[in-house]
């Protein structure tokens, strides 16, 4: 319950989204560079942008809080509970504060990395559903699979929407699976790449325990046998099974996709190249 509020020095922002955020502020909010932040200089669409790409509300609140208040000279990351517990008017700053999207991004990154994987799963499912990669209701097996994908992607996931870049190839229907044209032309289409992929397919056929450890060992032996560098095959393999050159580790991708899907996609890549 709000017991006390103070107006900031400049006029209220006209946009309703910003009005609710800034009505209780004290200092003048400025944009990067010169001049006050106002409805005329700050695009209101950006509010929806932060929501739709998957910024954490806690990260945004943490950043906005420190634009007009500070706990001390060194503490930046605060939970909502800590903000409530430590807040006093005596530490409200009087100088104008500048809204810096890059600074907000750093808060988002840190909050994201600290977030429990179960909460990430719950928050990312709606993004996958919006992209029509997951149905409603969500099948029971999706939770554990998505947990493994998130763990494999690690700190590559900066916002909730990033899950679309790192997991679409896990959930897409095989008839809709497609390759990034530039990645395919560079990594799979060259004759030498196609030949190595064809040979490694036969290695995968013989892998009985299709998990990260055995797959890594199989690839290492293949590299030694062929007298090649890991980069000569791993990028080709990644594009063949995921359709793109970025994503979680290639061994995680293979294990999560499963043997049947991997062989099917490699066959498609060989037929397409």
Task: Name each model feature, range by range.
Residues 83-92, 131, 153, 177, ...:
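Short, mixed-charge aromatic SLiMs
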Residues 212-272:
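Charged substrate- and nucleic-acid-binding regions of tRNA-handling and nucleotidyl-transfer enzymes
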Residues 107, 115-118:
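Near-N-terminal "mature-domain entry" segment
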Residues 1-107, 111, 125-127, 235, ...:
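Alpha-helical recognition segments enriched in aromatics with Gly/Pro capping
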Residues 75-78, 99, 119, 214, ...:
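Alpha-helix N-cap and coil->helix boundary residues
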Residues 52, 109-113, 158, 205-208, ...:
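Amphipathic alpha-helical interaction elements
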Residues 72-75, 96, 138, 211, ...:
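Short, surface-exposed helix-loop/turn micro-motifs enriched in polar/charged residues
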Residues 117-226:
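Small-residue-rich helix-loop
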């Amino acid at each position: 319950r709000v017991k006390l509020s103070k107006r900031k020095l400049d006029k209220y922002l006209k946009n309703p989204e910003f009005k609710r955020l800034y009505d209780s502020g004290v200092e003048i909010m400025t944009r990067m560079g010169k001049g006050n932040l106002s409805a005329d200089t700050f695009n209101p669409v950006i509010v929806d942008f932060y929501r739709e790409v998957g910024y954490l509300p806690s990260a945004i609140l943490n950043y906005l809080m420190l634009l007009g208040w500070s706990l001390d000279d060194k503490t930046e990351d605060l939970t909502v509970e800590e903000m409530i517990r430590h807040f006093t008017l005596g530490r409200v700053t009087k100088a104008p504060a500048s809204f810096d999207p890059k600074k907000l991004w750093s808060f988002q990154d840190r909050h994201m990395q600290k977030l429990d994987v179960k909460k990430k799963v719950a928050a990312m499912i709606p993004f996958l559903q919006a992209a029509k990669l997951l149905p409603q209701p969500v099948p029971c097996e999706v939770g554990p699979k998505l947990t493994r994908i998130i763990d494999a992607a690690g700190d590559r996931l900066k916002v909730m929407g990033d899950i679309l870049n790192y997991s679409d190839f896990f959930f897409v229907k095989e008839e809709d699976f497609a390759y990034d044209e530039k990645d395919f032309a560079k990594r799979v289409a060259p004759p030498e790449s196609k030949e190595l992929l064809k040979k490694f397919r036969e290695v995968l056929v013989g892998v009985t325990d299709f998990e990260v450890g055995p797959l890594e060992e199989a690839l290492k032996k293949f590299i030694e046998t062929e007298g090649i560098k890991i980069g000569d095959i791993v990028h080709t393999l990644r594009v063949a099974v995921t359709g793109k050159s970025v994503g979680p580790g290639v061994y995680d991708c293979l294990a999560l996709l499963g043997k049947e899907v991997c062989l099917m996609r490699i066959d498609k890549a060989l037929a397409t190249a």
